[in-house]
Amino acid sequence: METDGGGWTVFQRRQDGKVDFYRGWEDYVNGFGHFNTEFWLGNDKLYKLTSRGQYELRVNLEDFNGDKAYAKYSNFYIGDKSTNYKLTVNGYSGTAGDSLKRHNDHAFTTKDKDNDTHSSVNCAKNYKGAWWYYTCHASNLNGLCLCLKLLNKTKNKCNVCCFKQYRYFARPYAFNFKRSKLWVFKPAECPQGHQM
């Protein structure tokens, strides 16, 4: 596990597209990637971590212009394997908008294990990444990031690696991201004045 002082644990990082996030169930259960570059910690580890008391979540985002935003949630928990790692998240604050609200109380879906509530498609297959989908998403930070060159010709492809509530400057790609980092911490363990 990667920690950053006083109880912070990073469980997802994307920054350069060198690690493939379009993977199956077992990879997401066990984790993959490299802690010093891009990785997913693993749903089993995330469940074990968040089951030890109240945890908060912070989502750090950076778009293709270098603009940054964050979302913070005062309550974050992942269920165990029997719940398909169901997400519990609430208590939003921040600058990125609440793009996880609609994902609350939904199970984790991968390309080979369809747990979303969409009746006709597997959202993970459709959007090329595993996530806590409903029908299908308001955020998808494990999706295929295709917006590096701002694909103006294929708008729909720019709707994959995203946090949809983050809109500003009326740009069509304002909610698509080059970098993301998901952190959890136990409030009692976070030192006063700790900055991320």
Language model region names:
Residues 1-196:
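Mature extracellular or lumenal effector domains of secreted proteins
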